[in-house]
Amino acid sequence: MLHETFTIELPYEELGIKQQGSATITTYIKDVFPKDQDPFKRPLIVICPGGGYNHHSPREGEAIAIKMLDMGYNAVVLRYSLAPVTYPAQLFEAAYTMKYVRDNAAEWDVDPDKIIIAGFSAGGHVAGLLGTGWNSKRLDYLLENVLHCSHEYVKPDGMLLG
């Protein structure tokens, strides 16, 4: 399994956000097949744990990711920035995460048309922000000048809110 954590690097001040964000992405990717085989492309779920924007619930992150692996999904846990970091930082971090997943879909044997975002409680709010606001003008500067991709590229293919 490919299991690694890294920090999301965004120019928060340039994006109009006063506090520096502290978001991370942790991958839970099943073993990747050799490229000369015709591998099964798995769906992937981006998981946003809840916690009232003051912590990330441990039972809504890794535990859910492992369960999703058992169900045939690859998973990524987005630990978005918490208070005092304010909106739209979490929306930007979710968009960044979707781009990162799509950029790595071929390498991870992920079906690029089956990338879902899920969230619980406050994480459900973050998932809903991107799931319903992927084409928002709020994302224009980030997508055009920082991530260099289209609105459609960060659009989730499905949403699960809990």
Residue spans for each PLM region:
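Primarily recognizes the serine-hydrolase "nucleophile elbow" in alpha/beta-hydrolase
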Residues: 99-162
